[in-house]
Each structure stands twice: as C-alpha cells, then as structure tokens.
C-alpha cells in the first residue's frame, strides 16, 4: 500500500523573533491529506500543546498571543514534544506554515527529519496575487474558504486556530498546484504582486518606470530584490514577453 499523502501545517507561538534568544511556548498542528477522489482536504482533529520556553515571556509577545508565564510553568520542554509532532508516523510529505521561515528557525532539520517546507505566504503571492493582503487572517476573510468553522479558527495568534486557518489555505493551494510546485515556490524569495513602499506603493511592478525599478534591484529586502529582478528580466525579453518567466517555468 502506498504511503498516505499528508502535509502537516505547523504554527508556533514563541517568546520572540528567533532562537537562541527566544523559544517556543506553544505549537499547533493540522493535517491536510490527499483523498481517494484526488482532492486535498483537512483530516484529523489537529491539536496544540503549551511548551515551557525556559525563560520569561516578554510583555510585548504576551500582548500578541496572551500566553502567560504561569500558563507554561508546568508544560513540557520543547525537546520532549517537538519530534513526535514534527516527524510523526506515517511521515508527512512536507510541513507547511504561513511565513514558514519563522517556524523553520525553531523546527530544525534534526527535529523535522529534514522535511521540506511549504510557505503558504509565498504560495499565496503566486496563486492569489489580487488579494488586498497576504496575512493569514487577511486571506481568511478575503477568500472565505469553504467548510471553515469560524469559531474553530479563533482566537487568532494562538497555535491551533492559526494552524487550522492556514490548513484551509493549503488545502485550496494543493487543489490548484502540486506539492512539488508549492515546495519550489517556497524555496525562493516571495514574488510580490505590488510595490511595498515609496511613490509607487500599491502599484503593480509593470507600472513603475525603469529608474525606480533599478533602485529596487539593490533593496535590502530579498523579496523586493527578487521581484525587481523578475520584472527587469521581463523587460529585457524574459517573463511574459519572450522567454518564460520564473513563475511560468515553475508552473
């Protein structure tokens, strides 16, 4: 019997931005599986567990997820809970998260058995570029995914509700593109549909002049640089005109 095709969505709540200064205080998960009908759907109940981060939770992050030090004082340690959640049996074909680079900092290859990651933020840029925004919750209310239980996806910024919401985005992405395609998009910087700042803010990249585009080619943000390079290549005869764009090649 072939192994089941399952992707596990992960969401973390932490004490701050990155290890080793900061640590996990909650992990949530929700599986999405390929059915016998060839369609992807949420499967299982998912879940979450609090984690003792081994350090105080700063007020600035308490204000986001509302997890207090006393909530995690008797919780298990990260090294005791991470591996069974991140590398369960049967093995998942990939892990997924919204802005997966954040989760991947804490969910190291040693804990995930080297699993590939799908970043639903990067994939949303490709599949739904017309969205007014690309946060997990913006996509939730702009797309209104079929079958989502509103209350089950609340409160926002807690690990299971966020994983549950992300799983609906992932389900719909997998019904539009392959696992391999989503992983490929996730391994390169985000392809932004609109300019983020400056006098052209909110405009499509094809609308800005050559001088403005040239300035973005050396931007500090890798997503902006990548997108500017993509648009520059299009204007030089690549992209939608002439050679295939990187996005078309991936498709």
Task: Label the predicted regions.
Residues 1, 168-251:
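Acidic two-metal-ion nuclease catalytic site recognized across multiple nuclease folds
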Residues 74-89:
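A short, well-structured juxtamembrane/interface segment
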Residues 78, 95, 146, 222-223:
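A general structural signal for well-ordered secondary-structure junctions
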Residues 15:
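Conserved Rossmann-like nucleotide-cofactor binding loop
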Residues 2-9, 20-67, 87-203:
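Metal-dependent phosphoesterase core characteristic of DEDDh/y 3'-5' exonuclease domains
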Residues 55, 59, 79-80, 118, ...:
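Generic alpha-helical secondary structure signal
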């Amino acid at each position: 019997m072939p192994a089941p095709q399952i992707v596990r969505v992960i969401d973390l709540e932490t004490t701050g931005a990155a290890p080793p200064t900061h640590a996990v205080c909650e992990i949530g998960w929700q599986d999405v599986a390929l059915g016998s009908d060839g369609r992807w759907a949420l499967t299982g109940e998912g879940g979450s567990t609090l984690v003792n981060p081994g350090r105080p939770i700063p007020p600035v992050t308490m204000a986001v997820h509302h997890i207090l030090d006393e909530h995690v004082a008797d919780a298990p340690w990260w090294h005791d809970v991470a591996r069974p959640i991140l590398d369960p049996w049967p093995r998942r074909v990939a892990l997924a998260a919204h802005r997966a680079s954040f989760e991947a900092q804490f969910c190291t290859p040693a804990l995930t058995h080297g699993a590939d990651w799908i970043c639903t933020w990067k994939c949303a840029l490709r599949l739904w570029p017309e969205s007014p925004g690309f946060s997990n919750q913006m996509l939730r209310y702009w797309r209104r995914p079929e079958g989502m239980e509103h209350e089950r996806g609340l409160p926002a910024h807690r690990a299971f509700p966020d994983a549950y919401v992300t799983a609906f985005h992932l389900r719909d992405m997998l019904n539009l593109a392959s696992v391999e395609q989503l992983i490929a998009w996730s391994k390169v910087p985000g392809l932004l549909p609109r300019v983020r700042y400056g006098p052209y803010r909110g405009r499509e990249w094809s609308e800005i002049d050559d001088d403005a585009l040239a300035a973005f080619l050396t931007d500090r943000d890798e997503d902006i640089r990548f997108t500017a390079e993509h648009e520059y290549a299009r204007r030089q005869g690549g992209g939608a005109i002439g050679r295939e764009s990187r996005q078309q090649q991936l498709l």
